[in-house]
Amino acid sequence: MAAAATMAAAARELLLRAGTSDMEEEEGPLGGGPGLQEPLPLGELDISSDEFILDEVDVHIQANLEDELVKEALKTGVDLRHYSKQVELELQQIEQKSIRDYIQESENIASLHNQITACDAVLERMEQMLGAFQSDLSSISSEIRTLQEQSGAMNIRLRNRQAVRGKLGELVDGLIVPSALIMAILEAPVTEPRFLEQLQELDAKAAAVREQEARGTAACADVRGILDRLRVKAVTKIREFILQKIYSFRKPMTNYQIPQTALLKYRFFYQFLLGNERATAKEIRDEYVETLSKIYLSYYRSYLGRLMKVQYEEVAEKDDLMGVEDTAKKGFFSKPSLRSRNTIFTLGTRGSVISPTELEAPILVPHTAQRGEQRYPFEALFRSQHYALLDNSCREYLFICEFFVVSGSAAHDLFHAVMGRTLGMTLKHLESYLTDCYDAIAVFLCIHIVLRFRNIAAKRDVPALDRYWEQVLALLWPRFELILEMNVQSVRSTDPQRLGGLDTRPHYITRRYAEFSSALVSINQTVPNERTMQLLGQLQVEVENFVLRVAAEFSSRKEQLVFLINNYDMMLGVLMERAADDSKEVESFQQLLNARTQEFIEELLSPPFGGLVAFVKEAEALIERGQAERLRGEEARVTQLIRGFGSSWKSSVESLSQDVMRSFTNFRNGTSIIQGALTQLIQLYHRFHRVLSQPQLRALPARAELINIHHLMVELKKHKPNF
């Protein structure tokens, strides 16, 4: 129906537009022709905006033309007027039908209207009820806010009362002295656990009362008298107990570590005295310091005296220096030496004293050693003495810090009050001993013992001995340097002419140096010290100069070289046993040994093969300068060299080998020298062959008598010593 209405409206508009157009064509815009049945009822039509209206009509028509029914009607050529009337008729029928339906449903509509009216009344009453309810809610919300404010105020009052109650409870609990506390302080022995527990309670109550008194609390006066009497009783019992423990240290043969351990269990006793009776605490501390300082001093003085009795009877003296000859001390009234002076400069097993296992080994027991007739070097006694000192000092320092509740400088001062006299006595004894000590190895080992003990003390977190270690090192280092300088001076001032008969074997002074230097180098490698290396460098220079001075006493260069090689080889061998291969001493003597060995080989080859050596050098020089023609005048000389070498080389090599093996004490070194000499001889003969291959000497008849180089090598290998 909507489509039909749309088509009808569109048809009317088209007809209206078409009629208007026809009228305009036939009669003009204002005329009326015979085709016009009646004038258009314009009514109140506003023609002032006809253009705008026509535009709207155009738009409306254009929209209707898009309708499918209109398009279909236009396509089929239906008469629009007739179609419009038909549609209008249908619309009227529909309208009448709708009216009849409305009339038929009028009762229902009236009933619906009544129902709507009733609903409006109900909704109005609901609105009134909701309004009243909203008003009630507003008043309730106000009451709730009032209740919340009242509740908050009550909570604040409750918390305040609880806080006051807690404070008052604490105050009352702190002021009340229970009967259990009184009975424990008055009757219980101090060693019982309940005495310690109630003593802690008494200390807390006394502190609380002092705090409340400072605030002006009047109730403190009620308990002050009771607490004071209990405090006096507790102080008296504690004082007697601690002094009794301290006095027990004085008993002979008492292990004072046991009472110390017992005191640590009751360290709160001293804390109580410190907080409640400082005069008594000071009395106990002073008594402890006085008692323990005497005990330590007596113990270490006795131990040190007994310890020195098990030292070796034979010790180094001022004449036991590196450059002093063995016969210097022998006199008419002198007794024979129980040891060789060379052992003073030898490390041997003495270095084990600084090994980790020996360093912290149990201390020596002098009477046990005396029964077993055992004797020890000074460094072993020094280690035992200072390990005991280290162990007891660490234990004492930790006890002082824990029992007397001190730390930092206060702990240092208290420690030195206890151990100061003992440490001072030990330093004086060491200073006195070092005055007549000439054993550099012993002093150097003592230095390294101190360095290691200092590290142990640092690991145990005991800094109280730091100053003592510095004082000990301040005594040891200068003495060590002095002894080393004395040895340097003794070597420097040694006159080779006063040493007796000359011998190409290693000298005893160089052997002393080798043993001594290797000992110090091996010890110094563990904790390197630059000053030590400088002093050893000075000693090495003097020993090298001494070796050269002694070598100069030999008449022949060959003997000089044999002496130098034997000494350099011996010193190098000893050093390499203990020092690192890349140490300065090893490198220096290796270079000296190589240089003198090469010179000796040339000196060794010179008598039997000197002519051959001279000719080869001269010929090579001529060839290098381009004067090879001058070799033609050397044919007779070359012939003599060829025949002389061929007839005597075997005997010369045999004599050379025997001479070398007789000259050198180190068989391995002698073998190396023979090997080098034979290698150089082969190289020399090979160079001789190259010279004879020059055109100027190639036609020499004597070349036929040359020994084949490979044959010579095979023969020379037979002279290589085998081990």
From Swiss-Prot:
Modified residues (Phosphoserine): 355
GO MF term (any one): syntaxin binding
Pfam families: Vps52_C, Vps52_CC
This protein's UniProt keywords: Acetylation, Coiled coil, Endosome, Golgi apparatus, Membrane, Phosphoprotein, Protein transport, Transport
Membrane topology reported for the UniProt record: Peripheral membrane protein
GO biological process, one term: protein transport
Modification N-acetylalanine occurs at: 2
GO (cellular component) term, any one: recycling endosome
Region (Disordered): 21-41
Coiled-coil residue windows: 107-127, 194-215
UniProt xrefs under InterPro entries: Vps52 (IPR007258), Vps52_C (IPR048361), Vps52_CC (IPR048319)
Subcellular location: Golgi apparatus, trans-Golgi network membrane; Endosome membrane; Recycling endosome
Function: Acts as a component of the GARP complex that is involved in retrograde transport from early and late endosomes to the trans-Golgi network (TGN). The GARP complex is required for the maintenance of the cycling of mannose 6-phosphate receptors between the TGN and endosomes, this cycling is necessary for proper lysosomal sorting of acid hydrolases such as CTSD. Acts as a component of the EARP complex that is involved in endocytic recycling. The EARP complex associates with Rab4-positive endosomes and promotes recycling of internalized transferrin receptor (TFRC) to the plasma membrane.
PANTHER family, A to Z: SUPPRESSOR OF ACTIN MUTATIONS 2/VACUOLAR PROTEIN SORTING 52, VACUOLAR PROTEIN SORTING-ASSOCIATED PROTEIN 52 HOMOLOG
UniProt family annotation: Belongs to the VPS52 family.
Protein's name in the database: Vacuolar protein sorting-associated protein 52 homolog
UniProt organism field: Canis lupus familiaris
Gene designation: VPS52
